[in-house]
């Protein structure tokens, strides 16, 4: 086989060169006394072809035999940290003092008992927000219609422009307000 590789080298086949280099690398690992020059590696390759060297058998390593203590160490360290961060238990005297402290009350805490009133308030707030949003969308539509009035006039003159086209165009312009948050939309409308 070595003779076949020499013939391939003379031809200039790049695949054989790659294979030969690969083989050289594996032999370089097996012998430490060889130099890295190409002439000495060629000689060592010829020697290897003549005398097969016995491969040292590596003892198979069983993963179960490996003892890993790092998990145990981290568990111990984390328990120590948790113990140091835990507050000391409160005495009975401290519990009594804490229970005697009166909590402050406000209008919100006193109203919390009536759930019907809070539901009505929430519904009213939702309705008010919906009205304000509709009003804001309509104002945005008027702003866009005035900005694009010349373009809209040209579209109306087209033969394929119908009432449905007008409604579709108005909804499209109005839905453009959804890309802004309310503060930005208010700022645009105020300009």
Curated annotation (Swiss-Prot):
Name the InterPro entries for this protein: Ribosome_Assembly_3, Rsa3_C
* Biological role: Required for efficient biogenesis of the 60S ribosomal subunit.
PANTHER family attached to this UniProt entry: RIBOSOME ASSEMBLY PROTEIN 3
Which Pfam families does the protein's record reference?
Answer: Rsa3
User: Where does the record locate the signal sequence feature?
Assistant: none
Could you tell me which residues belong to the region Disordered?
A: 1-101
Q: Where in the cell is it found?
A: Nucleus, Nucleolus
Where is it predominantly found?
nucleus
Write out the GO cellular component annotations. nucleolus; preribosome, large subunit precursor
Q: Where is the composition biased (Basic and acidic residues)?
A: 50-59
Tell me how this protein assembles.
Answer: Associates with nucleolar pre-ribosomal particles.
What this protein is called in its record is Ribosome assembly protein 3
Question: A GO biological process this protein is involved in?
Answer: ribosomal large subunit assembly
Start-end of Low complexity biased regions: 32-42
Any idea which UniProt keywords this protein has?
Nucleus, Ribonucleoprotein, Ribosome biogenesis
Q: Which organism is it from?
A: Debaryomyces hansenii (strain ATCC 36239 / CBS 767 / BCRC 21394 / JCM 1990 / NBRC 0083 / IGC 2968)
Name the domain of life.
Eukaryota
Please state which protein family the record places this protein in.
Answer: Belongs to the RSA3 family.
Compositional bias, Polar residues, is annotated for: 76-85
- The question of whether Nucleus is a record keyword is answered with yes
């Amino acid at each position: 086989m070595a003779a076949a590789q020499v013939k391939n080298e003379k031809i200039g086949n790049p695949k054989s060169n790659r294979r030969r280099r690969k083989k050289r690398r594996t032999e370089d690992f097996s012998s430490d006394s060889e130099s890295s020059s190409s002439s000495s590696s060629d000689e060592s390759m010829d020697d290897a072809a003549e005398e097969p060297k016995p491969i040292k058998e590596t003892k198979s390593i069983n993963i179960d035999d490996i003892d890993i203590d790092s998990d145990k160490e981290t568990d111990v360290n984390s328990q120590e940290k948790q113990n140091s961060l835990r507050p000391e238990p409160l005495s009975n005297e401290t519990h009594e003092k804490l229970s005697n402290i009166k909590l402050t009350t406000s209008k919100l805490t006193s109203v919390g008992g009536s759930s019907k009133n809070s539901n009505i308030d929430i519904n009213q707030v939702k309705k008010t927000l919906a009205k304000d949003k509709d009003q804001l969308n309509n104002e945005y539509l008027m702003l866009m219609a005035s900005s694009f009035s010349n373009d809209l006039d040209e579209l109306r003159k087209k033969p394929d422009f119908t009432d449905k086209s007008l409604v579709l165009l108005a909804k499209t312009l109005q839905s453009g307000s959804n890309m802004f948050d309310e503060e930005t939309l208010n700022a645009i409308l105020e300009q």
